[in-house]
Amino acid sequence: MSKEKNKNEVFGKEDVLSVSGDYGIVNQIEFQGRSFAGASVAPYGIVDTGDIVYTKSPLKSNPYGIIKVNKGKAGIVSTLYAVYKPLDNVCSDFVQIYFEQDARMNNYMHPLVNKGAKNDMKVSDVNALKGEVCFPSKDEQIKISEHFANLDHLITLHQRKCEQLKELKKFMLQNMFPKKG
C-alpha cells in the first residue's frame, strides 16, 4: 500500500484524478468538467502511472467498489481512495483485467467489507488486500494484458469506423432527399 501523500503540494487541483467504472482512472477536470477537490489537496494520495487504486464508492454492478490501474499520467486522489504500488511479481494491468469481471470483484470484496448504516464501506486500505487471488507468472500476466490491450484497441478502431459509417449514411440521406424550400 502506498502512503505517499501530496504534502508538498507538488500536484494541484488540476491534477486530481477520479475512478470511473467505464473509463478507468481519469483527470477530474477533463472528465467531469471541474475539480471536486477540497480546500487543500495536501492530504491527497499520489498516484503514479501503473499504480492500482481501489475506490470504496459503490456502483450499481459493484456494490463494494472497484479496482483500476492508472494508465495515464501521475496525479492525486482523494483520501477516500486507497493507492497501491504493484509488487515486483505482479503486472498492474493484469490486476485490472482480473477485477474487471463484476462477479469476481464482488466475490473478492464481499467478505472483506462491512457496510455501515449510511451504506458506506467499512474496510481499511490494508484489509482490502487480505483476499486471496491466484495469478499466473508475471510473464503470463504480461502476455494476457497485451492480448486484452490489443482487443481494446481493435474495439476502439471498430467503434470509430462505425461512427464514420453513421456519418456517411447521414450525409447520403441528406443528399438523396434534399429539403424542399
Show where each model-derived region lies.
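Feature detects amphipathic, helix-rich regulatory segments
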Residues: 1-181
